[in-house]
């Protein structure tokens, strides 16, 4: 999205300024605020997406449904909703925190660094997926149990943040519980 920024964070994870999103993601990316979201359909299937080849970091890599950066004055729920519309063309409901304290630092093969305080959410998709080709090159609906097994067996095939999110036992259980609520 044109004009999108990241909120920079200090050592206490407090806002410390803003920087244009593409300028922020470099070989020495400063700590900044982000979010990650796992989307599910009413049957409890998870939407795994493959990042566009045009992405600056981890192009072509399979990852969780959607990620992004909240903008100044925007709640996480508003940011998740905005990015779901922009990246996947979907409307969502039932946004729930999965791993509010998640943070990570990872270096892509091209040297670009992700360095984020990145709360993780789950949400239910309530419309058809219409991906933005600049963001998503492919997607699949899969059972969560199958996805979690694939992440454990072949972590190299997925984004590092998705792998780390799934490795957290509390986050895994929260995802499983979210799916159980969807399935009734």
UniProtKB/Swiss-Prot annotation:
One of its GO terms (biological process) is isoprenoid biosynthetic process. It comes from the Bacteria. Its main location: cytoplasm. Transmembrane segments: none annotated. It is found in: Cytoplasm. The keyword Isomerase applies. Its EC number is 5.3.3.2. The keyword Acetylation does not apply. It holds the Pfam family NUDIX. One of its GO terms (cellular component) is cytoplasm. Mn(2+) binds at residues 25, 32, 69, 114, 116. The active site is at 67, 116. Its cofactor is Mg(2+); Mn(2+). CDD domains: NUDIX_IPP_Isomerase. Keywords: Cytoplasm, Isomerase, Isoprene biosynthesis, Magnesium, Manganese, Metal-binding. Homodimer. Catalyzes the 1,3-allylic rearrangement of the homoallylic substrate isopentenyl (IPP) to its highly electrophilic allylic isomer, dimethylallyl diphosphate (DMAPP). NCBIfam families: IPP_isom_1, PRK03759.1. This is Isopentenyl-diphosphate Delta-isomerase. It comes from Klebsiella pneumoniae (strain 342).
């Amino acid at each position: 999205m044109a004009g999108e920024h990241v909120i920079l964070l200090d050592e206490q994870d407090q806002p410390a300024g803003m920087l244009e999103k593409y300028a922020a993601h470099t070989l020495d990316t400063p700590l900044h605020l982000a979010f990650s979201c796992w989307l599910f359909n009413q049957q409890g299937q998870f939407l795994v997406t493959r990042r566009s080849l045009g992405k600056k970091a981890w192009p072509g890599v399979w990852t969780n449904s959607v990620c992004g950066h909240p903008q100044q004055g925007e709640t996480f729920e508003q940011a998740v909703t905005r990015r779901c519309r922009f990246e996947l063309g979907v409307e969502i409901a039932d946004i729930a925190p999965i791993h509010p304290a998640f943070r990570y630092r990872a270096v892509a093969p091209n040297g670009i660094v992700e360095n984020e305080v990145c709360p993780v959410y789950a949400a239910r998709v309530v419309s058809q997926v219409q991906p933005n080709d600049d963001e998503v090159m492919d997607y699949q609906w899969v059972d969560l149990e199958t996805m979690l097994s694939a992440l454990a067996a072949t972590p190299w095939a997925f984004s590092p943040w998705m792998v780390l999110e799934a490795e957290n036992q509390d986050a895994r259980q929260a995802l499983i519980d979210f799916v159980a609520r969807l399935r009734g």
